């Protein structure tokens, strides 16, 4: 989920899938207080297929909340504890955040139906066919990614070390397109049918290129990459790797035990887990449980497919990674992408570890974190440290 600053506030009521008059409520401490303004809660689906949960001020017409929501990430329900009004809450399943609304419709007979409809749209958004728009083309995913800010992309990936939003998005696309896609080489070889998420075309394992084949030239591939085009690339095109599923690399007990046996790896990974006072062995088990969880494995598999579809180039480019990593993402080469990430690490570091002590010490004074920490140091503490020296 993430918010947008503008874009859907001018939508006419006819385009809204559900709408009703309701005001916002503000939380102060453990209490929520009603905002007296007249408001409207509505849900709509944009052209890229994403669902929006919105609240706007009916007097000014300004949309103050515009949230892009993904299936299974939210729940909308009535607050039964409130006896003085009709209060509903939008619960974020991935965090403790809550948004409260108080009904402003004069009649109560449609409250339950509107609540049911909100949850239906949150968890089962209509497909393009249901909206009467026909089948969506392979450019939909790339169009959507190109129009996201870096902050939205970060939240789509669910933050560092998580990929909940991307998993939900690709899973939603997969449910809309149960049919398989055929990918064949330009030489006329047999097609390989693959079950893939909609708009994510995963290449089949390429065969050795024929000398007399009419495979696409490197210049043509580079031209399409530069134009942001190419929702798929020929299987025989240079720069593509074998179809790799990252989720198959970690499930083995030996691989996971090797990761958690290294204290540096454990320190790197636990920062991405919920805070806990568990002892070291319990934290290792928590890491192991997360890596082997179906949710993580599914997200990892879907990221593998998405990157190898050559459609994540615009996403990777916004994270200001190396040119090699961006080029690998545009070409859909997962192996080159991982190698590029390894090259960009500080000397002595690995994909799962940290720099050596000497390297870390040399780089610390230049990091923003260190500067921020110095700026926030208590002056009294500094004087005491100087006396001790």
Swiss-Prot record:
Compositional bias (Polar residues): 194-204
Any Pfam family: Rpn13_ADRM1_Pru
Keyword Nucleus belongs to the record: yes
Subunit structure: Interacts with the 26S proteasome.
Keyword vocabulary terms for this entry: Cytoplasm, Nucleus, Phosphoprotein, Proteasome
Family matches, as InterPro entries: DEUBAD_dom (IPR044867), Rpn13/ADRM1 (IPR006773), Rpn13/ADRM1_Pru (IPR044868), Rpn13/ADRM1_Pru_sf (IPR038633), RPN13_DEUBAD (IPR032368), RPN13_DEUBAD_sf (IPR038108)
GO biological process: positive regulation of smoothened signaling pathway; proteasome assembly; proteasome-mediated ubiquitin-dependent protein catabolic process; ubiquitin-dependent protein catabolic process
Encoding gene per record: Rpn13
Family: Belongs to the ADRM1 family.
Protein's job: May function as a proteasomal ubiquitin receptor. May promote the deubiquitinating activity associated with the 26S proteasome.
Bias (Basic and acidic residues): 372-389
Major subcellular location class: cytoplasm
Chain positions with Phosphoserine modification: 6, 185, 207, 217-219
Chain ranges of the Pru domain: 12-125
Modified residues (Phosphothreonine): 196, 205, 367
Name by which UniProt lists this protein: Proteasomal ubiquitin receptor ADRM1 homolog
Gene Ontology CC: one annotated term: proteasome regulatory particle
UniProt comment concerning the protein's domains: The PH domain mediates interactions with PSMD1 and ubiquitin. Preferential binding to the proximal subunit of K48-linked diubiquitin allows UCHL5 access to the distal subunit.
């Amino acid at each position: 989920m993430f918010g947008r600053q503008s874009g859907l506030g001018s939508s006419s009521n006819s385009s809204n899938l559900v709408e009703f008059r309701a005001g916002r409520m503000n939380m102060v401490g453990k209490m929520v207080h009603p905002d007296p303004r007249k408001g409207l809660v509505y849900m709509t689906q944009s052209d890229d297929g994403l669902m929006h949960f919105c609240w706007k001020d009916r007097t000014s017409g300004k949309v103050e909340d515009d949230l892009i929501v993904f299936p299974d990430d939210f729940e909308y329900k009535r607050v039964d504890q409130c006896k003085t009004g009709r209060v509903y809450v939008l619960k974020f399943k991935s965090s403790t955040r809550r948004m409260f609304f108080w009904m402003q419709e004069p009649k109560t007979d449609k409250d339950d139906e509107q609540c049911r409809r909100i949850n239906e749209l949150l968890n089962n958004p209509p497909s393009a066919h249901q909206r009467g728009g026909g089948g969506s083309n392979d450019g939909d995913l790339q169009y959507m990614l190109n129009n996201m800010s870096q902050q939205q992309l970060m939240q789509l990936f669910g933050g560092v070390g998580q990929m909940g939003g991307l998993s939900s998005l690709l899973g939603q696309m997969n449910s809309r397109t149960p049919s398989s896609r055929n990918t064949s080489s330009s030489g006329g070889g047999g097609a390989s049918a693959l079950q893939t998420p909609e708009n994510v075309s995963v290449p089949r394992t390429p065969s050795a290129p024929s000398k007399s084949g009419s495979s696409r030239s490197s210049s043509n591939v580079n031209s399409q990459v530069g134009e942001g085009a190419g929702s798929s690339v020929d299987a025989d095109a240079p720069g593509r790797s074998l179809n790799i599923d990252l989720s198959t690399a970690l499930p083995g007990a030996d691989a996971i035990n090797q990761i958690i046996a290294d204290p540096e790896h454990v320190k790197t990974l636990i920062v991405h887990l919920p805070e806990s006072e568990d002892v070291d062995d319990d934290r290792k088990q928590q890491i192991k449980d997360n890596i082997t969880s179906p949710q993580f494995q599914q997200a990892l598999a879907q990221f593998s497919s998405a990157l190898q579809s050559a459609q994540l180039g615009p996403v990777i480019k916004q994270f200001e990674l190396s040119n090699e990593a961006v080029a690998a993402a545009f070409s859909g080469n997962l192996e080159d992408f991982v190698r590029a990430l390894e090259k960009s690490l500080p000397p002595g570091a690995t994909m799962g570890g940290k720099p050596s002590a000497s390297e870390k010490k040399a780089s610390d004074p230049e990091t923003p974190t260190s500067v921020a920490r110095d700026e926030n140091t208590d002056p009294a503490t500094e004087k005491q440290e100087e006396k001790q020296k």
